[in-house]
Each structure stands twice: as structure tokens, then as C-alpha cells.
Curated annotation (Swiss-Prot):
Keywords: Flavoprotein, FMN, Oxidoreductase, Pyridoxine biosynthesis
Residues engaged in binding substrate: 8-11, 66, 123, 127, 131, 190-192
Protein name: Pyridoxine/pyridoxamine 5'-phosphate oxidase
Described purpose of this protein according to its UniProt entry: Catalyzes the oxidation of either pyridoxine 5'-phosphate (PNP) or pyridoxamine 5'-phosphate (PMP) into pyridoxal 5'-phosphate (PLP).
Gene this chain is encoded by: pdxH
An individual GO BP term: pyridoxine biosynthetic process
Free-text cofactor note: Binds 1 FMN per subunit.
Length: 212
């Protein structure tokens, strides 16, 4: 087996200072995200979403960012999935973007709210037909006897709805409204740059440097 202690790399691609970053974190995120897209990274909108249930049990999974604006970060899912039930019990969550090739991470924390039905309908209509049918066929996060059951359900809903399946009432979007963000740039000797934004009531965003 590979010796895990030997798996390491030196980070040399960039630096980040307080004078480099935008005054608000959403502008800074868009800047870094655009650079990740320009670098042709695979799925730059992939992010880890961490939630906590009513008993304090955490869980995490990779989801795709589908919207970003001054209000926050938008993603879509089944409201009855594990993450949906977690968010119903505890509407706070964390996101993590890891752009390995750029030696960068972005951490986001905040409260989560459902987007409007109109927003969910508009996004659902852009999804491929198979994904729209799949939203009906899959009771996400629940046990299923076998893949054949999923495929049978898919065929049933494809026959039922044809080319225009509507959005299921249990499926839609969430928006994470950030209260804290951290931008991490790898540096040599593990002295990484960590610039954090913290939302201060009544005064806006505070920018601070954190020790690596």
C-alpha cells in the first residue's frame, strides 16, 4: 500500500493578499470561479455540501452549483432527500469548492432557503429529458430493491409524461445565503494564504487574514 505520509506536494502557483481581493466576497468568488472556468477545470461548479440533521449528525456530498448572484449560491435537489430533510431540520450549511489545479479552495457558510417556484420551474425546464424523468423515478436517498426497479419506474414515467414532464412538487432549488467565506491559496512551506470575509451586522463584510 502507498505510504500516505509520502503523499504531498509543494504549492507554488499563486499568492493572495488583502489588497488583492474584492471588497465583497461574491465579487471575489466570481473572479476565482471565472478563472477556474477559463483554466478548463473539470466541473468547476462541483462543490461539497455539508448539512446537519436534527440529532447533530453531519453528512456531506458533492452537488453542482447552478446559480450565483449577490443573494448567494443556488443548487437543486429532491426536498425529500437526506440533504433536504437535514435542511428542513437545520437550515444552515457549508460549501467547499476545491480547484486542485489552481491550488485553491473556497469555503462558504450560511443559512439556506428555498428558491421560488418560478426559479425552480425555470431551471427544471432546462434539464435534459432523462434528468427530468429521473426526478420522478427516484425516491432519492431511500432504499430501493434493485436497479431494475429504478429502470422500470423511469419507463413508466417516460410513458406517462412523454417529452414534457413537469417539475415534481418535492423537487426544487435552495439558495445558501452566505455569512462567512474563506479563500485559500496554497503557498510553499505550508504557509498558505487564507483570506476570510465575515458578515458583520449593520456594517457589512469584514476582511481578515487567518493563520494557515
Amino acid at each position: 500500500m502507498t505510504q500516505l505520509a509520502d503523499l504531498r506536494r509543494t504549492y507554488v502557483l499563486g499568492a493572495l493578499s488583502e489588497s488583492d481581493v474584492a471588497p465583497d466576497p461574491m465579487s471575489q468568488f466570481k473572479r476565482w470561479f471565472d478563472e477556474a472556468v477559463t483554466a478548463k477545470l473539470p466541473e468547476p461548479n462541483a462543490m461539497s455540501l455539508a448539512t446537519v440533521d436534527a440529532d447533530g449528525q453531519p453528512s456531506a456530498r458533492i452537488v453542482l452549483l447552478k446559480g450565483i448572484d449577490d443573494r448567494g449560491f443556488t443548487f437543486f435537489t429532491n426536498y425529500e432527500s437526506r440533504k433536504g430533510l437535514d435542511l428542513a431540520a437545520n437550515p444552515r450549511a457549508a460549501l467547499l469548492f476545491h480547484w486542485v489545479q489552481l491550488e485553491r479552495q473556497v469555503r462558504v457558510e450560511g443559512r439556506v432557503e428555498k428558491v421560488s417556484d418560478d426559479e425552480s420551474d425555470a431551471y427544471f425546464a432546462t434539464r435534459p429529458l432523462g434528468s427530468r424523468v429521473g426526478a420522478w423515478a427516484s425516491a432519492q436517498s431511500r432504499e430501493v430493491p434493485g436497479r431494475d426497479v429504478l429502470e422500470q419506474r423511469e419507463q413508466e414515467y417516460r410513458s406517462k409524461f412523454g417529452e414534457n414532464p413537469p417539475r415534481p412538487p418535492y423537487w426544487g432549488g435552495y439558495r445558501l445565503v452566505p455569512t462567512a467565506l474563506e479563500f485559500w491559496q496554497g503557498r510553499p512551506s505550508r504557509l498558505h494564504d487564507r483570506i476570510a470575509y465575515r458578515l458583520q451586522p449593520g456594517t457589512g463584510w469584514q476582511i481578515v487574514r487567518l493563520s494557515p
